């Protein structure tokens, strides 16, 4: 059974497919249907796929999220990754984090330079570092403890650049982890 059919088994039972990374969401929602434009099953899967931040925001708008959310210990710089911006859904990571009481959120909408394997390949790593350097500088100026990116690879790449350049020591995590901190789950 192929991945499409496995995911559709759940979609046909009434579930949504929730992606944890912006690149996976972009692939399932937009790129796969472009690659196979005549496949109705792929179109169906695409319509029932959501980014995890988008999913939480939708739940809150429809039903309100669970009580018990508390302030966190510091501000957050949200890196709005390229693959999230390409989905044209707005900045759902920021919208989700706004659910946390009294949170300070700063936004950086700039390429991290990672680009999937581009950022780790020996031949292109130096370019990835060069592209990401300005983004890291912008993040450092925000002076927040946390840097949350809806693309974990971009977040880790930016964190590595921070360590290489000795700019700052942000903790790079996924926005859903910030929400988990606000619920005292981690």
Describe each model-derived feature in a short phrase:
Residues 1-186:
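Iron-sulfur cluster-binding electron-transfer modules in prokaryotic oxidoreductases
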